């Protein structure tokens, strides 16, 4: 027999500092390399692949970053405990506008001119430094929250090997003819000087108020020339400077309306909305197709056109949902405009420069920023009599997702990946993917795929993966897939090249067939100036994290595709999309099988966290106040993770109190009592009766435990941490507030006794298994408790232990149902006692119970009800003739009015005339009842009837859902004395705690009573009192002078005690 197996359990103190405990656990994990060992012991087993979505290292982490990282940690821990090898490689998204904007702020510069004046090489060096600096902050948060991921070998999208892999992927897409340069309308940020992709666009909408103007365009040709004007609506008056045409729908009817002073052409369905009152139709009606090529006077003559323009064109996209049905066309600033005007050979006129300002020579708006030019333009239209109506229009307008500058839709040459060509493949891959929650698949994400547009890949920026395309003066192009290939093409060794701007820009590729007499620039290819969308970087991580295919190809193949990825819901248009798109473009299949989408984390006040509002919670201070486990539990198990949730100190304090400390206190109770007296050891617990031979209460909690294993296992397999959390919370409450409390007397049993062994063994088995089940969600407190509970042959850490398996033979659904009934009846009885104002410790003569299933309860369970309700006798309600409660009912007019309207008075009268007892019984049994209203049976719900109960004198009654408990309130002298004895026991137990006694300490007890009934109670219940308070002597008298004294004036007694 080992010494370890016979040692008492180490005590878990009653009080615990959770953050301090977590720091100690972190130290132990690192010293003993627990994470590394968890990987070592599963290596060679089945693999479960998880991809770390790389956070953008452009600032310090917020508490919302904890959410996704909790989910990234829970499931790999869970799968590892189930024997899977789960390699967890961290990653950092290093490139892109987020980093550039942050560095610009640090340097006190703004815009591309300032960056180029500062120097691209130095600017990019500062970007690299910024990334590395912020990586440290994320690393600290990751460690503190207990997220196990390999930070030492993290991939970084700025590393040479990663960039080479991205180049390889771009070359694959190029070779398939899916990467093209085109002159298209793209979302464009004038401050950043670059286009954005549609998935970036989706992340930056803000609510703004813009002018909504209706403008007259006088007709200059056609049957209405000189008589009428086209009425055009726009919310972007600044684009009127470049007006080229007016589009109408060919099939819509357009009419002429007059107010007596002028005539306006408007789509017939919009006459009322656009013109208002006072307008009549002249009777002239034209199909849109008839208006084609009618010319008009353009609203501004600030820019020159080099070919004919300013006539009506046809566009099927024109609608009659709002506006006037006539749409102003400025092809430089709208994709639909560009498409329609191109078909008519109309010119594209763009007077707005790359920085978003109008060209300086223009009247009215020269050098003005496009959004602020509206006011001057609208005022000029009004002065010239062209402004028909001006309103303020609140709407959602796209802004740059990083610098928050209003975007323009701008005609610029850009590089596009033709993702529209693989739309059907993307939809097919999505159909195979398991989305959590399921509605995202065909909803938010499916809709995004169905409306797929080509991916605007290029960015006119600096800190990013350079687009690996070199172009000769004659337009020939080469796409390069690696530094090795570039070395061969350029004729120099570039294996150590930093593949970023400006260094890669200096590399030229000579044309071997060029005339050597030509100037150098005419004989070499230079790289195009753009870098690529940062989302392509992160979308390439399945292979680029390994540097594949140039290196580690086997590693990539073994880790593709992923069984699991997870991020916030907005990544449906970000990383989730780029991952699927890149892999489908390159490999013909998606790179993931299961994806979890998380709702956003809000501040406690329900608003988005922001520095401006002062409601940001920093993760490290929060964890050092409440503990990381509390924050982890909130993220994983509080409410629905798929919905927005509010986090704050209040909810975290509640988690600590209701979940973590309730669990810990049960474990502390076990170790305290197991160590009391001679103490219990693992060997002694092993000799406990078999589960099926233990008392009913033990069999019940073990049944609940093994049902819990199944529930939590199934929930986590389906990525449902909320269900797992609810089940665990319920069991923790069952264990602490029912099982432990109901079993307290058995925990006093001496070592080696069957009743004590059964109780201790059952509680140990529950705590051990509960600790295993909670470990993936709250890894700190469970590993701390594990150290106290650990069997001699158990792993050093709970995170090295195996996931528990349910024993179906111990699951007893019938017993679970019976115990649930017992607890419902106890709650009803307690409610009845509270209503009566009677003390909880005052025994009552009897309780009467009316409930389906009560008659079948075994005596042990009936005894539990009696003891919990503190009654001497428990009988069925049927033993009492007549009713113990008088009922009255009346209508709830507020609830009835919502449903019945004008017929409410007749329904209310039917309720008054109904038999109250029958109506209440039906409502409580079925949550619904019928009444006769003018010969028609009307179904009422419970909230539509107000029920008043009046118990008969001497009784208190509580009922719910067809179950009733009635308490007899008549007190005999014997019951009163028993109640006093209970109060005395409470006084002594409180005194034991206050005097610093241990739970197993025996005492000497002296008492003296001035109240006659109290004195009688002490004499009558001396044995019971002594047993409960561990008194080896029970003496009437004053006792030792140095004994601990308690005086109760209420019960007229003085108590003194000291340790025996």
Swiss-Prot record:
Enzyme Commission number(s) of this protein: 6.1.1.5
GO CC terms of this entry: cytoplasm
Top-level EC class: ligase
Compartments in which it is found: Cytoplasm
Protein name per UniProt: Isoleucine--tRNA ligase
Binding-site list for ATP: 611
Protein's organism: Thermobifida fusca (strain YX)
GO molecular function: aminoacyl-tRNA deacylase activity; ATP binding; isoleucine-tRNA ligase activity; tRNA binding; zinc ion binding
Cofactor(s) required for function per UniProt: Zn(2+)
Keywords associated with the record: Aminoacyl-tRNA synthetase, ATP-binding, Cytoplasm, Ligase, Metal-binding, Nucleotide-binding, Protein biosynthesis, Zinc
Family label: Belongs to the class-I aminoacyl-tRNA synthetase family. IleS type 2 subfamily.
One annotated GO biological process: isoleucyl-tRNA aminoacylation
